[in-house]
């Protein structure tokens, strides 16, 4: 348990109806008792909201509602106080400073949740899901984070880890007590147990890409040569004028990123600079960034200008698009067509090709539908509670999967039990790092530093 008491503003800084200053630690009640004067005298009950004033000496700082929550049945398993004041920056900072002057310490980023983890109320996957819950951009992302906060994924990971630990214990008995009258575990039994665990991990990894998209968004790059309508498409999809649209080629010189929601899936839409050879230094940097985004994108929207013949730049981009998940738009179909559609169909025969006109708003709905269909063929679901979505979890799960596969290979090769045990121990370690049962302090600090203050 901690010996110090922390304090932070838990609501966004700015103007609002209500702001919250939160304290947690052994002296939380005593510190607030020095600041809070209730309108009705008497002992404040646990989890009772009480009306009164925060005061500094004889001066009233703000009119507030205060709730005290006694350990261990709190978010951090420590005494917690939440002061509900007016939401302006002045009252919030005044109350924060009073708490600091009376013995509290300013909380680090994510320290309330870190204390909840270190005090055993939640494990590391649940702690990380708190930030996912706050930053969720769609209902599916929110539901996924909520399931993980409830501990569904944790139970699945812990169950896998316990199976490996049980198997390792059986192997160790066979190694350490060969002379005892104990039935020795066989290679076949070890193989069967490892195969079952391998299958369980592979099921989790199968859904991991879906989970990552739900959590982080489908990175979708709009690419094409300059002035084909990329910025117009982005504005049409967002139903807002985020990107500058002009007749001048090369207007977009930097990446423009915005999130949109299609069928409950967060789409990270990226309007790129037109890809072409240029002597303009600033535009050249934008083109290089566009190429990098193209390489990293989950989905590419490739735009062509129907009113012009195919250029060398079009053909160059087309050759890159062939091997990618892509939707092809032949834009400006309101103008007389000069483009070679036969060549496009031959080269990109396996791609969805849509004719559009940003000017007349033709084909926008079809583009949205195509994106939704491209999102893993509509296979993204959140009905399964144990979907893995966090990149850190996925990496550790992949490593644990390799550990189990290596152990199974050692069994097939009839290597000594000591060799098999090494890989099983590594698998236990990696699964434990997901839930926080085996994790280093530096990693914990790195994880919680990504949280907001007051959480």
PLM segments and residue spans:
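Inter-motif core of Ras-like GTPase G domains
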Residues: 283-307
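C-terminal-of-GTPase-core extension/linker across diverse P-loop GTPases
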Residues: 2-9, 13, 37, 52, ...
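Switch I (G2) and immediately adjacent beta-strands of P-loop GTPase domains
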Residues: 51-62, 66-70, 251-278, 296-299
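Generic enzyme active-site microenvironment
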Residues: 269, 303, 329
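Glycine-rich, N-terminal phosphate-binding loop of Rossmann-like dinucleotide-binding domains
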Residues: 87, 237, 272, 304-307
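Conserved beta-strand segments of alpha/beta enzyme cores
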Residues: 105, 266-268, 352
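Short flexible coil/turn linkers enriched for glycine and charged/polar residues
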Residues: 14-15, 57-61, 73-78, 110, ...
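A glycine-rich (often HGG/GG-containing) alpha/beta subdomain
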Residues: 1-143, 147, 151, 327
């Amino acid at each position: 348990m901690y010996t110090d008491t922390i304090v932070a503003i838990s609501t966004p800084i700015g103007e609002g109806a209500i702001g919250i200053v939160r304290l947690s630690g052994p002296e939380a009640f005593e510190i607030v008792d020095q600041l809070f004067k209730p309108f009705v005298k008497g002992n404040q009950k646990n989890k009772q909201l009480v009306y009164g004033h925060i005061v500094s000496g004889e001066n009233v700082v703000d009119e507030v509602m205060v709730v005290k929550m006694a350990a261990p049945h709190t978010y951090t398993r420590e005494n917690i106080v939440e002061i509900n004041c007016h939401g302006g920056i002045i009252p919030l900072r005044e109350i924060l400073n009073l708490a600091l002057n009376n013995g509290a310490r300013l909380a680090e980023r994510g320290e309330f949740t870190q204390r909840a983890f270190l005090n055993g109320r939640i494990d590391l996957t649940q702690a990380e899901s708190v930030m996912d819950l706050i930053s969720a951009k769609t209902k599916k992302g929110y539901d996924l984070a909520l399931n993980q906060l409830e501990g569904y994924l944790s139970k699945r990971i812990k169950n896998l880890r316990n199976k490996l630990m049980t198997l390792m214990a059986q192997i160790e008995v066979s190694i350490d007590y060969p002379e005892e009258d104990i039935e020795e575990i066989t290679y076949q039994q070890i193989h069967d147990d490892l195969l079952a665990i391998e299958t369980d991990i592979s099921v989790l990894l199968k859904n991991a890409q879906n989970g990552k998209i739900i959590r982080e968004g489908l990175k979708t790059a709009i690419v094409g040569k300059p002035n084909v309508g990329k910025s117009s498409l982005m504005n049409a999809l967002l139903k807002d004028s985020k990107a500058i649209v002009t007749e001048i080629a090369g207007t977009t010189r930097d990446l423009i990123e915005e999130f949109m929601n299609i069928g409950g899936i967060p789409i990270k839409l990226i309007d790129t600079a037109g890809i072409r050879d240029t002597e303009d230094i600033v535009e050249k940097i934008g083109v290089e960034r566009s190429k990098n985004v193209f390489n990293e994108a989950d989905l590419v929207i490739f735009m062509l200008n129907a009113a012009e013949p195919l250029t060398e730049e079009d053909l160059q981009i087309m050759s890159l698009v062939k091997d990618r998940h892509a939707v092809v738009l032949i834009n400006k179909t309101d103008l007389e067509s000069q483009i070679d559609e036969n060549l496009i169909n031959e080269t990109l025969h396996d791609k969805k090709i849509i004719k559009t006109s940003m000017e007349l708003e033709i084909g926008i709905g079809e583009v949205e539908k195509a994106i939704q269909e491209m999102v893993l063929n509509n296979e993204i679901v959140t009905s399964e509670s144990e979907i893995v979505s966090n990149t850190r979890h996925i990496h550790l799960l992949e490593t644990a999967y390799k550990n189990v596969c290596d152990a199974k290979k050692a069994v097939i090769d009839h290597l000594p039990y000591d060799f098999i045990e090494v890989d099983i121990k590594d698998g236990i370690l990696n699964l434990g790092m997901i839930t926080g049962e085996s994790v280093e302090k530096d990693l914990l600090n790195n994880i919680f530093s990504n949280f907001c203050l007051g959480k």
